[in-house]
Amino acid sequence: MSPCGYYSKWRNRDRPEYRRNLRFRRFFSSIHPNAAAGSGFNGPGVFITSVTGVWLCFLCIFSMFVTAVVSVSPSSFYESLQVEPTQSEDITRSAHLGDGDEIREAIHKSQDAETKPTFYVCPPPTGSTIVRLEPPRTCPDYHLGKNFTEGIAVVYKENIAAYKFKATVYYKDVIVSTAWAGSSYTQITNRYADRVPIPVSEITDTIDKFGKCSSKATYVRNNHKVEAFNEDKNPQDMPLIASKYNSVGSKAWHTTNDTYMVAGTPGTYRTGTSVNCIIEEVEARSIFPYDSFGLSTGDIIYMSPFFGLRDGAYREHSNYAMDRFHQFEGYRQRDLDTRALLEPAARNFLVTPHLTVGWNWKPKRTEVCSLVKWREVEDVVRDEYAHNFRFTMKTLSTTFISETNEFNLNQIHLSQCVKEEARAIINRIYTTRYNSSHVRTGDIQTYLARGGFVVVFQPLLSNSLARLYLQELVRENTNHSPQKHPTRNTRSRRSVPVELRANRTITTTSSVEFAMLQFTYDHIQEHVNEMLARISSSWCQLQNRERALWSGLFPINPSALASTILDQRVKARILGDVISVSNCPELGSDTRIILQNSMRVSGSTTRCYSRPLISIVSLNGSGTVEGQLGTDNELIMSRDLLEPCVANHKRYFLFGHHYVYYEDYRYVREIAVHDVGMISTYVDLNLTLLKDREFMPLQVYTRDELRDTGLLDYSEIQRRNQMHSLRFYDIDKVVQYDSGTAIMQGMAQFFQGLGTAGQAVGHVVLGATGALLSTVHGFTTFLSNPFGALAVGLLVLAGLVAAFFAYRYVLKLKTSPMKALYPLTTKGLKQLPEGMDPFAEKPNATDTPIEEIGDSQNTEPSVNSGFDPDKFREAQEMIKYMTLVSAAERQESKARKKNKTSALLTSRLTGLALRNRRGYSRVRTENVTGV
């Protein structure tokens, strides 16, 4: 007998030999003639002498596999398989791997990094466990249709905007200024400004009749009647002129541009009064409940703009006495720009403490509405869901929810404008878009939606559906007797009584995001529900069809189908109309599988095995079981799968995570799984994706509407207040006040009161005074110049210094005139020793002179003489005569200037007296001691 050949392989991912091709090795045994050496076999060889021995071994261990589940660890298989590559194989491998083969090999390794394979042992089913296929199911039929209604809708919201109208403000601007007049300046010490209302009689008889206004203002302050006159002059009617600046929507007229002020004589207070008649056309605003209105001037009138004396308007709110209010029917106001009269109208006038306001009266119900249109929607779908109506508006990406009962608009105060306006809009849309394709079904319907929105809805029906309904109605009328009438509950939904509440108001949210989110949710819900319904129905139908396929394929391969259905590895067999199944346990970790490299039957040249032969070796020494490799790593505990040997035999079998290739019933090589092309039996599920829906930025209330919610427009008020001075007064005009002019005017008025003679004297006095004032003005102007002031300051400083030195000189003349007149002569007197008498006689001529006393270092020559009493008396006489000479010269000089005889005569006599002066003796010119 020829030896039996075995092929074995160790699985070890850490060794490089694992991925390489196997080489053939054969070893011969005396038992089996076709034995082959297993490459890398590391255990004791197991030799089976004959086929009978295989069956005996199988019967010995079969009971163990049937009663207990033997599991094989994935690692045990690879531990029992090992390939020792030869040198030629390494050379071949290196020849096939180029620069890019390393990357390919790394990719293959990453693809082969899978879980370790599991081998199953499937015993033949004995019929102890039988199953059957479930009969076909009845697939559900989902009806997603709802009661949809097409239509046109107009959505209304709460009107938060103020009611605006034109009003005219009449007042007189009274300014009383008190000024103090200084010598060269004018100072305002007090200023009083007030607004005075213009009487209605002056408005009707002067302003709107002649376009003029009086310069007199009469008003009440502190419970006293006060009068003011422009420029403190007699009153007169002054023409109204347009203001220089006007704001948007506002015009104004006034009588003067100047503010009158009087500057009196220096040191006096004067008061001046100016009265400016001002008429302003302003914007007035009133908000719900319209019990007051505000003006763009900042004033608030606590009276309804709809207050009047007719049509029940006297019931409107008012906080003023009736004598302050006047209403004129057919009143014609004058346009102060064109001087033309306007159309007759009902004119209201109200006199307040500071102004008079006038406006045209109009009925309340025709002017204001508590609701305002928000959106016009041409295509709306209404459906009933959970006892509510849903209005889906795709153009706005919103869904509004309301009750199924209609809403009575009469419950809302001042909502009379809604139906008329909505009807006109719906008629326009229907005429332009749906006139040829749809018909109207009933009248317009109103619903109160969540969030405070009122939906005015017009149901529509396509022409095709209308024809079907008409045919159905004709058929019903033919089949029923004419005595029968429709029951009253056909319109019970609309006939539900609604409790009316008078003066009801609604509050609309400032955001519509909730409606947009509702629309998005409904859109997603509709799409998902429809998709799931279709999938469920299709899935059920597919299962019924697959059931028929399962039933037909079970006789062909019951084990594969049963394993797929039961989601576990089983062995199955058809037993009539039922299926017998048995469980396929996994091999344990103490088992090793050996794959043989030959598929030929020993001793036969025509019979071969159709599946590879394997040997299951237990590592715990319990024995070896021979079998065949089944499909999907199934281990068959028999070798009954035979076939006639054929030429050019080529087979691929899955063994673990790889395919083994047999050619002519002999093992050739191992092939990786990823090297075998794959075809898929799966069908992709093509579902419709959810459509994109973008949220549109919708504003319930615009910025202008939000700005108009208040009673006053503060921006307009600030604009008006800042322009007030520019509009009615000339801020660029400067009036120069001169105190000298004031003095001259006062003196002129005084002399004019004295008559003709006084005027003549006044001209002379005013001329002299004018010259004096001009001189003073020139001097003050020079001083006002910075350089002039600096020069004057320097001169004053120099004068002060000169005065200081002059004062010292005069003081010196008074205290010691000789020292002041003869400082050098008297210098030696300062050098006399203390206690020495300057008038004492010198003892001898050799004594130290006076000039040398106390100064021994003086190198100048000294006068060697002492005090001489005679010389002292002579000096006194000389001083007297010098005084007389000076006086005579002054007298003679004055006489020459005046050319008068008396003065000359006096001068001559004085000279003669001096010449004939007794006691005069000639002064000696030589020194007494002699030099």
Swiss-Prot record:
Keyword Signal: yes
Domain of life: Viruses
Renumbered ranges of motif Golgi targeting: 881-884
Glycosylated residues in this chain: N147, N257, N435, N503, N620, N686
Matches recorded under Pfam families: Glycoprot_B_PH1 (PF17416), Glycoprot_B_PH2 (PF17417), Glycoprotein_B (PF00606)
Function: Envelope glycoprotein that forms spikes at the surface of virion envelope. Essential for the initial attachment to heparan sulfate moieties of the host cell surface proteoglycans. Involved in fusion of viral and cellular membranes leading to virus entry into the host cell. Following initial binding to its host receptors, membrane fusion is mediated by the fusion machinery composed at least of gB and the heterodimer gH/gL. May be involved in the fusion between the virion envelope and the outer nuclear membrane during virion egress.
UniProt membrane topology term: Single-pass type I membrane protein
PROSITE patterns: TONB_DEPENDENT_REC_1
Disulphides: C122-C584, C139-C540, C213-C277, C369-C417, C608-C645
Similarity section: Belongs to the herpesviridae glycoprotein B family.
Localization per Swiss-Prot or TrEMBL: Virion membrane; Host cell membrane; Host endosome membrane; Host Golgi apparatus membrane
Segments on the Virion surface face: 72-786
PTM: A proteolytic cleavage by host furin generates two subunits that remain linked by disulfide bonds.
Descriptive protein name: Envelope glycoprotein B
Result of altering Y920A: No effect on internalization and Golgi targeting
Motif (Internalization motif): 920-923
Residue intervals on the Intravirion side: 808-931
Region of interest (Hydrophobic membrane proximal region), residue spans: 731-784, 764-784
Signal peptide interval: 1-71
Coiled-coil blocks: none
